[in-house]
Amino acid sequence: MAGQKIRIRLKAYDHEAIDASARKIVETVTRTGARVVGPVPLPTEKNVYCVIRSPHKYKDSREHFEMRTHKRLIDILDPTPKTVDALMRIDLPASVDVNIQ
């Protein structure tokens, strides 16, 4: 598979889980002999939700909640069949969304 490239995008709400998953992927790929670029941190997406604290009135009293989505990008250059097999067998937490292109 010379000249090929695999791009892995990771998304998670917890930055520690996404960093541990990225580290595990990089270790697995380097062990199989392919080259790795990354993990590259992409901009964190921040969603803020404003909610009125009281159920009926007092509109001036509000509460803000935020959700941060952390993203990482990993490129695997010149993957071998052994690399692809190792990536399929890797065990990652359920809180990390993995998109492979």
Swiss-Prot record:
Name this protein carries in UniProt: Small ribosomal subunit protein uS10
Query: Does the record carry Nucleotide-binding as a key word?
Result: no
Q: Which Pfam families match?
A: Ribosomal_S10
What is said about its interaction partners and assembly?
Part of the 30S ribosomal subunit.
Q: Which HAMAP family match?
A: Ribosomal_uS10
* Gene3D superfamilies documented for this protein: Ribosomal protein S10 domain
Q: Which GO terms describe its biological process?
A: translation
Question: PROSITE patterns, alphabetically?
Answer: RIBOSOMAL_S10
- Its gene is rpsJ
- Any one Gene Ontology molecular-function term assigned to this protein's record: structural constituent of ribosome
Task: Give the superkingdom in one word.
Answer: Bacteria
Question: What functional role does this protein have?
Answer: Involved in the binding of tRNA to the ribosomes.
- Give the UniProt entry's GO cellular component terms: ribonucleoprotein complex; ribosome
Please report which protein family the annotation says this sequence is part of: Belongs to the universal ribosomal protein uS10 family.
Q: Which UniProt keywords apply?
A: Ribonucleoprotein, Ribosomal protein
List the PANTHER family: 30S RIBOSOMAL PROTEIN S10 FAMILY MEMBER
